[in-house]
């Protein structure tokens, strides 16, 4: 049986069962554990499956992003840990971008005492928080308003970002995998691509609960990021997959 045939069978089994063990796959195709692992790694690189401990599962699909209010209550400890680690990378006097989201809001909460900082954001909550609690210079992108996430999206926001020179961009996502970050909202893609082009350094900040999920629009491949910051809940298989792509991964320890 050639690799293409094996991988098709794997996809069919995963589609039927949701999650399949490596033992099941080796028995079904009468091949070695190592052969199956190579097939699974190839499929994961394509974004077709997600490796889990001892097996493989289909990637979860994000049909829509939760509202800001809902996201605030999710993975709070992990986001705080990521925010603290990300903030430690910021230098006084720099110009940074904080993408819309509750993980990036956690970064802002650790930056309120930093001197001579300029923060660019498309997020109204982040801008409002920094306005009340810091002395930093705040630049808001403006643009079409996304009510659910209290942020600006679309071409107007993207055009504004292209006019800036950003030292560090901290970019968030509702879903990520070895293929990259994705979103169910097309109007968010142009903003993320614009800030990636405008920034000297790009940092993905995303908690491990979102890993292995996919949405309709691929916003940025992981190769666009200089660093990825996540929490210690990331599966070992995911860490190995990211290491194979020679990606810089920083793990924030949950306190």
Region locations from a protein language model:
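N-terminal active-site wall of soluble small-molecule enzyme domains
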Residues: 104-106
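HTH-adjacent hinge/linker in prokaryotic transcriptional regulators
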Residues: 2-30, 34-97, 108-116, 120, ...
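Glycine-rich beta-strand-to-loop/alpha-helix junction loops that act as flexible
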Residues: 99-101
